[in-house]
Swiss-Prot record:
Known function: Involved in the regulation of innate immune response. Acts as negative regulator of Toll-like receptor and interferon-regulatory factor (IRF) signaling pathways. Contributes to the negative regulation of transcriptional activation of NF-kappa-B target genes in response to endogenous pro-inflammatory stimuli.
Keyword terms: ANK repeat, Nucleus, Phosphoprotein, Repeat
Keyword Nucleus assigned: yes
Organism: Sus scrofa (Pig)
GO biological process, one term: negative regulation of tumor necrosis factor production
Compositionally biased tracts (Polar residues): 13-28
Signal peptide positions (record): none
Modified residues (Phosphoserine): S150
Protein name, UniProt field: NF-kappa-B inhibitor-like protein 1
Stretches with biased composition (Acidic residues): 150-159
UniProt GO cellular component terms: nucleus
């Protein structure tokens, strides 16, 4: 006698069939709404696009190929870019070629730097280290030289190279110091100095090294060309300018901290809201912030007030060692390349520069860095 097959209740059977259908229908509706959202952006109907996302907050604003941020950069559509960033679009999102929105903005040239590249960089600085399938970072597309060091192992490698170079320089300076101090062992007026910082010690070593070289040239009676005769003066002038650069940077940082502390103390006592501002220029009037944030002329350029990047690079080279000393000149140029590299400069001084001057300052720093790279290549 055969057992009857178990009967599934009619309600459960209908539920099991409807679940995948309802899930597929929900996915299809979401995809249609996302396509409609992208059409609104392409047509410039930003209010409709924002209203659609408010009614359906689960939509993916990065969906599509190319993604909406990439399309806004390619079309030079700054209002759409600002809306997407406000709605939570991810600048690090990659398309099928591995490009981020920063890659797309970098390919639009200098005209898109202020309106597209800087807002994306401010929202997601880590995207500068993302490479596409061709192995390029946004900084390489802009011609900034070495890629942005975003991975921890690359940062450690760069730090180890920097430490190795400093140790080698310290060893050479110690050898020179031993030679110099041997000449003054019998000097009764020589006093033991207190321990000093590494920066002060290295500056003193460089000055004494230059004096020793000058004394050797005088005793040997060697005739130098005009460039070599003025090299010691240029070297001392360059050291003085480096010292002034450090002092101005420290003074600006101290002024910024004091200004922030003063504003924090005055904020509770002044509850009156600020009046509405007319535009981006109104946020930073030309007379305001002079004592706390840098404008273009406040940056310690190699030439007073900035100027032509080639002229600034030539001025830096002229202040270095003479052309006959190839090794010393290459080391000097390496220090200047590190100091004026756009990535390093942006990381170190971004908070000290007026926002509305940042594009102009970074454009000049980029041009100066490229000019220094050309001088360094010419020495190889």
């Amino acid at each position: 006698m055969s057992n009857p097959s178990p009967q599934v209740p009619e309600g459960e059977a209908s539920t099991s069939v409807c679940r995948p259908k309802s899930s597929m229908a929900s996915t299809s509706r979401r995809q249609r709404r996302e396509r409609r959202f992208r059409r609104y952006l392409s047509a410039g109907r930003l209010v409709r696009a924002q209203a659609l996302l408010q009614r359906h907050p689960g939509l993916d604003v990065d969906a599509g190929q190319p993604p909406p941020l990439h399309r806004a950069c390619a079309r030079h559509d700054a209002p759409a870019l600002c809306l997407l960033l406000r709605l939570g679009a991810d600048p690090a999102h990659q398309d099928r070629h591995g490009d981020t929105a920063l890659h797309a903005a970098a390919r639009q040239g200098p005209d898109a730097y202020t309106d597209f590249f800087l807002p994306l960089l401010s929202r997601c600085p880590s995207a500068m280290g993302i490479k596409n399938k061709d192995g390029e970072t946004p900084g390489q597309i802009l011609g900034w030289g070495p890629p942005w060091d975003s991975a921890e192992e690359e940062e450690e490698d760069e730090a180890s190279k920097e430490r190795e170079w400093r140790q080698k320089l310290q060893g050479e300076l110690e050898d020179e110091w031993q030679e110099v101090i041997g000449r003054f062992e019998d000097d009764a007026s020589h006093e033991t100095q207190e321990p000093e910082s590494f920066s002060a010690w290295s500056d003193r070593m460089a000055r004494e090294h230059a004096q020793k070289r000058q004394q050797q040239r005088e005793t040997e009676g060697a005739c130098r060309p005009p460039r070599a005769e003025g090299s010691s003066h240029s070297w001392r002038q360059q050291e003085e300018e480096q010292r002034l650069f450090r002092e101005r940077a420290r003074a600006k940082e101290e002024e910024l901290r004091e200004s922030q502390a003063r504003r924090a103390q005055e904020a509770p006592r002044d509850p009156v809201p600020e009046p509405a501002r007319a535009g981006p220029r109104a946020e930073h009037p030309r007379g305001a912030g002079r004592g706390s944030l840098w404008r273009f002329g406040d940056v310690p350029w190699p030439c007073p007030g900035g100027g032509d990047p080639e002229a600034m690079a030539a001025a830096l080279v002229a202040r270095g060692p003479p052309l006959e000393e190839q090794g010393a000149l290459r080391r000097y140029l390496r220090v200047q390349q590190v100091r004026w590299h756009p990535d390093r400069f942006l990381q170190r001084f971004r908070s000290q520069i007026e926002t509305w001057e940042l594009g102009r300052v970074m454009g000049a720093v980029t041009a100066l860095s490229q000019a220094l790279n050309r001088h360094a290549e010419a020495l190889k």
